[in-house]
Amino acid sequence: MSASLSQLVHQLSARFNNQQQAFDNPPLYAHIVVNCRPLVHLLPGSLLIEQSYAMDPLKPYRIRVLRAQTRDEKLIIFSYSLSDEQKYWGSVYEPERMLKIEEKDLQAIEGCNYIVRKKNSNFIGEVEPGCRCLVDRKGVTTYIVSKFELTNKGEMRTLDRGHNPVTHEQLWGSLGGVFEFNRTTDFSKEIPYDWIEEWKK
C-alpha cells in the first residue's frame, strides 16, 4: 500500500492541460490548466492544486490542498480549503509563496475526500459517497459528483458535475463528457526524501 501511495503522489505532482481537446472541441471544452505541486514543508502527501483557465492562470477558479494518505488499507485523498485563499492564487508558479501555507490555514472539506483504487498502473478516484460534497455555484447549492483517472503515461481524465441536492438533477458540469489532460511539467522531483522514507515504514 505504501508503494501505491508513493506512486499516486508522484503521478499527481505535475502540471496538466487539455489544450488539444479544447482546440478540437472549443464549444464543449474550455482550455484548462491544472497544477498540482508538493507542499514540501507540510505533512507527507500534501499537495497544492490550482485549476484555472489557460487565459488567466494566476486566477484559479479552484484552489485546494490535497493530502494523500492510507487509512484502513485504503488510499484516500483528503481535501482542504485555504483560509484567505485569494492570498495564495498563482503560488504554484512561485514555490516560495507556497512555503507560507501553514497547517492552521487548512480547513477540512466535509464529504469531499476521494477514495482511490489502483487498477494496473493507473489510479481511479471518486468523491466519497453520500452527496455531501457541497459547492455553491452562481448562488445555488449543489453537490459534486467527481471522478478522475491518472495513468502512468502522464494522462489525467476528470469528470465533475454538480447536482441539485433535492432532485439530483444535473445543474452544471461537462456536457461533452470527460476532460482529457496531458502532463506538461513533472513536479515529482520536488517530493521530499523524508516523505518517501515515511511511506516505507
UniProtKB/Swiss-Prot annotation:
Keyword Cell membrane listed: no
One GO MF term on file is: lyase activity
Q: What is its EC number?
A: 4.-.-.-
Q: Which Pfam families match?
A: CpeT (PF06206)
* Task performed by this protein: Covalently attaches a chromophore to Cys residue(s) of phycobiliproteins.
Assigned protein family: Belongs to the CpcT/CpeT biliprotein lyase family.
Protein name listed in UniProt? Chromophore lyase CpcT/CpeT
> Taxonomic lineage of this organism?
Eukaryota, Sar, Rhizaria, Cercozoa, Imbricatea
